[in-house]
Structures are given as C-alpha cells and as structure tokens.
Amino acid sequence: MKLYINRNPVNGPWGGGNGATKAIFDHMVTNNLTCVGELPDTIIMLGLEREDNLGSLEELVSYKLKNPQTKLIIRVNDCDARKGTTGVDDRFLAASRHADGAIFVSEWMRDYFMNKGWACKNNTVIVNGVDQNIFKPFDGNTKPFENLRPKVVKIVTHHWSDNHMKGEDYYEMLDEFVGRNPYRFQYTFIGRTKAKLKNTQVVPPLWGKELGVALSQNDVCINASRFDPGPNSVIESIACGLPTYVHTEGGGGVEFAGHDHTFGTWDELENILTQKLLPNAFQTKTWQTFSDEVYSFLKGTSHD
C-alpha cells in the first residue's frame, strides 16, 4: 500500500496534528505501507494545508475526481468554532461528499460536523496518542492528591497557539487569583499567549522531554480552551498524572478530562482549586496504538 500524506512532520512545539503525522510516518513502514512524495493511486490521507503542505484539501479532492480508484481519507481536526474563522467548515463539508473515509480526532468533532450535514458514511474516531516515555508522572507519582494536599498548589497551563480562543480570559483571572494568594498557589504558563500575566511564570514553548518534565512537576492543569477539536495539551497533562480541568465549552477536551472535571465560570474554577483535586479517568494511549488504529482503518477502507 502506498500512502500519500499532504503534510510533513516537523520537530518543535506544535500541536497534536504534527504529532499524529510524525507517528504515522514513523510507524507505517513497519506495516508495509510506503509514504511517497508523489500522488499514488491507492490511499491519500490529508488535513487542511499549511505552508509546507504538499497539496491542499481542494487539490486532493480534484485528484480523487480524476482518479476515482484512489481512496481519499480525511483526518478532521479543525473547525470554524475553534478559532472564530469562516470557511473551514464549508471546506471539510465539501470534501466529505467525495471522501472514502474520515478520521475524527474526537467524538465532539464528529458530532459537530454530523450536525452540519457531513456526507461521508465511513467514519471513525481516533484520539491522538502520547509518548508515554516523555509524558509520565513525576517520580512515578500517579495520584498526587490521594492522601493530602500540598501546601502550595502548583498550577500549570500549556498551549503552543496564542489564539484568543485558547482561554486567555481565564488565564488572566488565574493570574490575579495567584497574586492574591501567593502563599497558597503558583501559576506557570508554558507556550504562547496574549494574556496579560503579572504574577505568572511564563515559559517559552517547550516540546518533547522538556515539556514532559516541566508539566509533571506541577499539581494541577487548567485548560480554558473553547471548542478545541482534540487538544493534545489535555492528553499530555493527564498522561503526566495531573488532575486536569477544562472549560465546559472545551470541545474534545471535555471528553478527555471528563464532565466531572469542567468549569463554566470563574467561581466554579476557584472552587475547584480550593477543594480536593482528583485524577481523571481518561486512559491515554501511545502513538503506536494510535498508528495501529489508523492503519486498521486505512486497510479496511482500501478493501471496500
């Protein structure tokens, strides 16, 4: 099987889409798949283009129309609600009329497009994986709040994108809260943000082992992102053993963190931070498992 992917993996602090691409590139050869640089006549997997992409969504649909034997697979990891854009939904919906299969990054992402008239009938949900050799509890501690609460609670947030939908309103309120309670709470923000933070340790974007170590040394992760299709930031903090709380409008983040780990107002978040913090029930998986699931779907689709 020859597989074409219209995106190249890169090293650095990027989102889950890059992690998924890298995992597929790393793993597919072991399953007798070949990632090729020219359009094949068998399988295509794609996402919305970036500057380094090898073919836009529309170009790959055009290729499919000219070569109907090609199996067109869409990985759906974006939407207009995520960043307040226009046109992203329409592009995916148009492509769904020609796709042979679609991989959604969360159930929320699937339901979002189904409610808008998604046309493809062969769909699956495959949640991103995580490198469990990197994102793991600090010193093997998997339940940091089982018996007692630390004297100073270390709060962390991490995002590689500084889009305002990532929750900067709550991060500014967190910053003010920590300023009022410096002997009870510390707040670290890792990544990019436009939030005005005075009492927060802001760390430039990290990735890989550096990010895993930095996350695991905290006590709780707060993620206020809205309408996030499948946030790897939530998966990574849970893998590090951190109780992770997300906004009620967090999109895919809610199904990862769990409905019992959500907040919809500042009062709710403050109450969470002053009570016993509980681990999430969500079980993360490796990128190997993710790639196995993708391969299984591709193989099944290619035989249809």
Question: What residue spans do the PLM features occupy?
Answer:
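Conserved donor-binding/catalytic core segment of Leloir-type glycosyltransferases
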Residues: 144-166, 172-176
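N-terminal pre-catalytic "stem/leader" segment of glycosyltransferase-like enzymes
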Residues: 1-51
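Acidic anion/phosphate-binding donor-loop and adjacent secondary structure
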Residues: 84-86, 130-151
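Extended catalytic core of nucleotide-activated donor transferases of GT-like folds
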Residues: 31-34, 39-98, 108
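Aromatic "clamp/platform" in nucleotide-sugar-dependent glycosyltransferases that forms part
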Residues: 226-227
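Short hydrophobic beta-strand element within catalytic cores of glycosyltransferases
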Residues: 243-247
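A charged, aromatic-enriched C-terminal amphipathic alpha-helix characteristic of glycosyltransferases
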Residues: 267-304
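Donor nucleotide-sugar binding/catalytic pocket of nucleotide-sugar-dependent glycosyltransferases
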Residues: 100-114, 119-138
